[in-house]
């Protein structure tokens, strides 16, 4: 009682109909820092109510969050409209690499922070790839990126791929002991491509037990 209640940052999820977008919406439900105010996806999904659109497309075992169902999905390519009124977007869209780079930069130029789940910008020298517990200092490179993009507040930051984020924290903890060599073997889940066995039947006979 009487405690200060922090105002949450208004955000959009771009790519809200895909598997990663769905997972983001679950994670963002009742989030203490972020308030989802917009959902965006492909032109084919635009103008439809999210709950109706996803009735037979929801892929997660967890139920679709109630708060998402009444959102009218916007066209992800309508950058100005989606960016209006939000400070940050989570981006998880399926596009050609060049198109994706252009889209994320367009959002950044609307002065919003773009947190990307995509690989397109991961190799850019001035786009930080962050594991917060390990290399938060890399965010300093954002100033260089802003100069390139001509922005004051907008920038892009990316998350690493699923393999890197699984083992790098362990290596970081052991770094002081002087690791000289490491042997790594990763096994990629088909869910990483946003698909399931039901949607990818050719994979069923392509698994070595």
Stretches found by the model and what they are:
Residues 2-208:
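N-terminal Rossmann-like NAD(P) cofactor-binding subdomain of oxidoreductases
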